[in-house]
Amino acid sequence: GLGIVALSSGIIVLYANSFVMKNRSRELGLYSVLGLEKRHLFSMILKETMIMGFVTLLLGIGVGALFDKLIYAFLQRLIGESTGLVSTFQVMTIPIVLVIFACIFGLLVLVNGFRLLRLNPLQLTKDGLKGEKKGRFLVIQTLLGLGTMGYGYYLALSVQNPVTAIMSFFLAVLLVILGTYLLFNAGTTVVLQLLKKKKSYYYKPNNMISISNLVFRMKKNAVGLATIAILSSMVLVTLVGAASIYAGKKDYLASAAPHDYSVTGTNVDVTSTRKVMDDFLSQSGNQVNRKTEVTYLYFGIKEQENNKLTIFSENERKVLPKSIFLVFSQATYKQLTGKDLNLTSNQVGLFTKNKTLKDQKSLSVNSQTYQIHDSLNDFIKGKVPNLFTIIVSDYSYLVVPDMDDFQESIKGTATTQSTYVGVNVKDPTHEAKKNSDLLDKLTDKETQQLAGQTTGLPKSYFTANSRYDAEGMVNGFVGGTFFIGIFLSIIFMLGTVLVIYYKQISEGYEDRERFVILQKIGLDDLQVKQTIGKQVLTVFFLPLIFAFIHLAFAYHMISLIVRIIGVLNPSLMLVVTIIVCGVFFLVYVLVFALTSRSYRRIVSM
């Protein structure tokens, strides 16, 4: 977080500095003509930067300390803790802030000093009026931009595993950023040149003026537009991810902790698991409202070829599985759903997230073929926890007629038996922490008493879970993640607004004299407004279109990444994405309207 904030601050400050120095070029040139040497100008800029840096740091640290308690109270509210105006301001962080901003303002001094050394007085006086040079190798840059962006999109769409998605995400982001800058730098110029060659379109007063203005300074426009597109994409991606995580925590809790208290026995029979739960209920004095006891198998898929599945062998080195299977007997299925499948020896029922298996009529598991008798719904949701949804995006529940026969058919494979006993109690909030700690102690004690399981990671063990612990963990993690997401979104949004504002003001001053000349040669006020409107629309909504396209291609990868954090409802994430896009569009249009008014006012002066 610190690195992202520091980098964002540096980019915003550098962009604002380029705007200010561009508009001061004539002033500095005049000082030089009047007799000031470059060392005098550099000394003046150095002192101005030091004063500006000191005032900025003083105000920033002061405002940060002032609102520290309020921000911390907001964070406490998000993570579900009792709110209070407690200060978290730490004096030891001030030197870190001072060093970061000293580096940023030191870089400003170097950039401005190099600019003074490079330009002579005459160049300084004309620098603000000078157009940008036309770039070289525009077609090659355009093709390279399309290639890098296309490959970034391919990475985002092709990844299927949540863990792999995290590793691929940053490479995809870098490729898309590079492609965006190349396309804005070269691709827009190529398109404008093609429009210039189209006489029926170009030789109209409004079109000619707008296109000529854009071509005249396209290099600078390209950097600004690409920066707006990237910052807007960052806002959208961060907000969609953070809001989806916060909105999806209830679904995750329902999946991770369907009961108030539960015990899971790994490679332990259900009688032993039930005994641990009974001991807990006896010692805690809780009265049971509902109880669920389930025995099932689970295993990872090593290879999949259409409907043919291969399970990892027992002594094989495990890697990340392509899919996870949970296997239940039809008796357990009837217990959970109240429905009887009436399966014969070679028939199975199947619920699957695996796209390849959804339309299959048969299924082969380690060369044993079964007919898929029924395609099932998610019958364990809210009844048995399935944390494997975090590891893989596709998982399956298999219902077999007889568990013993199925185990015999896959003998020698890496399968694990799990027994789950979960209870809902009459008053789940009564001494919830004390009860949760008691259940943890009981499961640890019973695990140690299992034969040969006293050291290391046991092959057979018990694990405890409670809704109280799950809620505390989820609220803390999700609330903190949401807070960071909102914080970063605000930073990116401020960066976007500032870049848009400086861009409009800068271009307004540059265009003013040109539009005065056009009015003098016969362009009326209506034509001036139409020309300005078309140019501003092009400049502003092109980055927004790119940002929405970036988000559309990143959506699949974002959904995989937030799955690890617990967002298990795709429909909910889609609704959140639409709302975020709608709100961002309204904010963007508002900024567009306000800055366009400033642009028109400057041009019309």
What are these regions (language model features)?
Residues 61-93, 150-167, 542-605:
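Short helix-loop junctions at transmembrane helix boundaries
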Residues 174-193, 250-276, 565-601:
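Alpha-helical transmembrane segments and their immediate juxtamembrane interface regions
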Residues 29, 119-131, 194-213, 508-527:
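Juxtamembrane inter-helical linkers in multi-pass membrane proteins
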